[in-house]
Amino acid sequence: MNTNQIKSNNQQAQRKTNSPCLKIVPLGGLHEIGKNTCVFEYGDDIILIDGGLAFPSDGMHGVNVVMPDTTYLQANLHRFRGMIVTHGHEDHIGGISHHLKKFRIPVIYGPPLAMSMLRGKMEEAGVADRTTIQTIEPRQVVKIK
């Protein structure tokens, strides 16, 4: 099935049920190591999954880190409900402090170790007061409003 068929099938399903569809918009982390960041969009709500960075390649002189393009997210901040962190590797949490310098993240959910690591990074960057961190346990259900 090609992309046009998928879009057509999604549009038909949406028209039949009159309910929104889930849109998944990767901002980084595809065909590369690093920048793992993904937007999940459902109706009027947006959730960000991870906020990673990548390290520069050898030819990128003077560059310390490489960040995903968050233009789409920044254009839709009024719909942004929060972030879910999957784990504490740099390619999944390393960009969050940088993001917090540019825009507000209402709440960040994640496992205890990742949240502890993230809290330290945020304090070091001076952005710890710009969001709320919520630790979640395995199989815990969280409703993001």
Predicted feature residues:
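Metallo-beta-lactamase
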Residues: 1-25, 41-53, 113-145
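Conserved beta-strand segments of alpha/beta enzyme cores
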Residues: 23, 107, 132-134
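Short Gly/Pro-enriched turn/cap motifs at secondary-structure boundaries
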Residues: 28-30
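Pre-active-site segment of Zn-dependent metallo-hydrolases
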Residues: 32-35, 44-85, 97-106, 110-114, ...
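Short beta-strand scaffold segments in enzyme catalytic cores
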Residues: 35-40, 142
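N-terminal Rossmann-fold NAD(P) dinucleotide-binding loop
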Residues: 92
